């Protein structure tokens, strides 16, 4: 705030502080509250920077228990740990049948959304739940290939999109339009996986 006093700030805990620069910092101090309460090290702190068009440009996904900080920006993504910082990239998986996919909790989806997810679950090789924003970090790190979620708030998503894209992944809504922070979001390691997933997801797109 001292270095960028004209920027807006939006957070889950703070609401919106207006700015005049056209830039908005979007903050979520603890994403994955249930994991935090349970003592599971998959909760994260999220910091996103959104431009005046509503596009997420820079993102940070920080997991202090594991000492992992994922940083995404136009043209690159990095993982910072105690041993230093190094570039990261998505996996080379191009087939949903070979993919590791994730969502936080399918039971918070609408019934049509659950139907779309069920088709993805039946097709993918491995399915994981309950990772919240950390699942998107692991797309960037190359161990998860697709995440699909719905009902996201801006503070849930603004940090995630730049990290995935910076690592070479893709992010869009369930119609296949370029992702904006919030709502329905699908991120994938490759165009092949994304195209296969959208066949199902478009049926329940908002």
Q: PLM ranges: what are they?
A:
Residues 1, 16-17, 61-62, 69, ...:
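Short secondary-structure boundary/capping segments
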Residues 12, 62, 150:
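Conserved residues at the C-terminal ends of beta-strands
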Residues 12-13, 28-31, 35, 145, ...:
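Acidic active-site catalytic centers that drive phospho-/nucleotidyl reactions
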Residues 89-206:
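An extended, acidic
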